[in-house]
């Protein structure tokens, strides 16, 4: 699939960056020295992201392109008026973004026809792949909100809506030191569903070639892009009591979307137009979202298929259900995930939460409210 492209450049050449691996503190390359490293080097790397690195004490796994933007991210000027939707990939991010944007913009459905990536830019998107190399090799350009997302956000006026998959400790320092207090809405989801969805997303959007068995191994090794699921969740969870942080779950959104809408509106200090609530619920339904080109990423899928960059055809929004993993995971793998979850949350306050029982397939049958 990638033979014609891989032949044009050295497979694992180091991309030049402002911060070399030697200069950066606590940055390690993911070496091709064990089973996980072999899978990553064989099935995850390509000319546009040709190395993974582990960043910081938590060893968050990111593409090497991140190092080019590390300082810009750290020193990015945050505003108190910013609204951030943060999540681990495939935890319900797009759904939450659209909900938050519409509430924040007084249910302006006409304005929501503009592409979500432009209205609600992905902060670190420019770090995920080397867009300069992509333009050079494929001859296609990307709009600034994709190819230079940090600069695009920096120049936006008014309230900025920002998406990120970065761990809490990699957010701009003005958030970490408390000098700025933007609204942060974090959404999480059963990690088993996240893994299945991330697998299909990776093949459809990223061009990853791993089969599900090998993908699951990398996911559980916590060397998948954006690192450990539970370190990610617990990093934000620790800040849940701050007045500028709201924690949502995908499962609660599926069970009672209206209550999540009202809770989010209250958090954002926005008054809802009750007459437009039915339209909002319809707009946020799975079928509507799946067929909405402003949010369904169909343009990206078509572009990647055109250039033969992805090994799988499909839709960005696949099932829109909870516990979909049961149709794709073996009982053995489900047990492995649950043991990993128990170990990962042990000793944290999260372990006493009802949602933890739901994620562990225990006696908790109903979806708890956060």
From Swiss-Prot:
Coiled-coil residues: none
Record entry for activity regulation: Sulfoluciferin formation is inhibited by the product adenosine 3',5'-bisphosphate.
Listed GO MF terms: sulfotransferase activity
Protein EC: 2.8.2.-
Residues bound to 3'-phosphoadenylyl sulfate: 90-95, 189, 197, 250, 284-289, 316-320
Family that this chain belongs to: Belongs to the sulfotransferase 1 family.
The protein's name: Luciferin sulfotransferase
Upper classification of the organism: Eukaryota, Metazoa, Ecdysozoa, Arthropoda, Hexapoda
Gene responsible for this protein: LST
